[in-house]
Design a protein with these regions (language model features):
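Metal-dependent phosphohydrolase cores
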Residues: 1-80, 84-190
Length: 190
């Protein structure tokens, strides 16, 4: 990799900019999705807060079930990464994950990730929160899509004996889903 001599933006020559921008774009495309995967992997050995699986295992279990059920690749990726922001902001981790993944997901999958917490509440039999809170969204075009996700792949994926494929199984999928959009973004800038 070429390195420029400048140590500030103001000192960088036109050639420096050409080198740094070109190499940056190539790397962003080559490594698309890796930052999201790394965030998920950072949860690998974290405590489970009393559940029988931790958040990382829950995520792998959910993605494995989605894959086995024949869901499409982008949906499997959305399932895998739906809780990647759990530790950043537990009470609004869906919004944070949704913001991170918005450019890379279809609208229905983005909305599903970004709003899953309020739908997940509907499956709780014990809660001080309003378990019917998702009703405010009834009629929304992605209501049923999100409810189905929470039922099939979120509330029901905390079993330590459920199949969990290795993260390596999903890495190429994440790279493809993020890479498609990254490629388009990087080549659309002047
Ligand atoms: Fe969640
Ligand atoms: Fe979850």
């Amino acid at each position: 990799m070429d390195k420029v001599g400048a140590t500030s933006f103001t000192a960088a020559t036109e050639k420096d900019w050409e080198i740094a921008v070109r190499q940056g774009r190539q790397r962003y495309i080559a490594d698309a999705g890796v930052a999201a995967l790394n965030l998920l992997k950072s949860q690998k050995d974290e405590p489970s807060n009393g559940w029988q699986v931790n958040n990382y295992e829950h995520s792998l279990s959910a993605a494995t079930k989605a894959l086995r059920n024949g869901e499409d690749e982008e949906y499997v990726v959305a399932v895998l990464l739906h809780d990647l922001a759990q530790d950043l902001d537990p009470m609004r981790h869906d919004r944070v994950a949704g913001t991170l993944m918005k450019p890379f997901l279809r609208p229905e999958n983005h909305w599903m990730v970004a709003n899953h917490q309020v739908f997940q509440l509907g499956f709780r039999t014990h809660s001080k929160f309003d378990t019917k809170a998702c009703e405010k969204f009834r009629g929304h075009p992605f209501f049923e899509h999100t409810l189905r996700f929470c039922d099939l792949y979120d509330q029901s994926c905390f079993d330590p004996n459920a199949e969990r494929l290795a993260i390596a199984t999903f890495e190429p999928m994440v790279r493809r889903v993020f890479g498609r959009v990254m490629q388009a973004r990087m080549t659309s800038y002047p």
